[in-house]
Amino acid sequence: MAKSRLSYIDLAVEDALRGYVLSGRAALLLSGTVYDVLWANADGARLLGASALRPLLDGEATPNAAIMRQIGAAASQLDQRDEAAAMVRARLGFKPQLVALGLTKQTLNNGDTAVLVVSDEMHGRRYEEDDMAQAAVEGLDGFGHASAIIGESGEIIAASDKFATLDMSTDSLNGLLDEVAQEDDRLIKRMLTTPVGDIAIGLARLADAPARHL
């Protein structure tokens, strides 16, 4: 499977995607050919039968072939229209269920074309923000040393087990939040000195009111 030229956090700040990091809907970003999965949220990975994002995006896990065929058939309609729809049968709990999907063409910030696939709310579930945040960081296991969803004032909404090892002070964290708030592309990347060594970090501003960050 071909990799995107953009990293997960680079794609997370795309206008079409940033609202789906914390969402009750499954979201997938597929290549223009619909053969490659470029990005997904936690429920998007589950929709394709993957337990985590890293294996799916690195090509180590094979996405559900039947669902990919159905998405591909629906995506062929995008040559004549702006939107398309598909109904797929996915195993999201104890038994398979029908999930409605909407497909739209997207042009990414780097000029690449892609197809965004978004489900209706997953089998009627209503997530609390804490649940969505925890699902997001758990899905990112293996992408880096640590991850977290951070609120407007630097509060940690959810974090991976290793995030505490970064030992970031409130002042340091709020300084980074102030920096990213000034960036038009909603993203900063820095080297951070931590007790476990110098680590490259990325901070993405996902939402503004209230502010939410990855």
Where are these predicted regions, by residue range?
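PAS/LOV-family sensory domains
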Residues: 19-21, 140-141
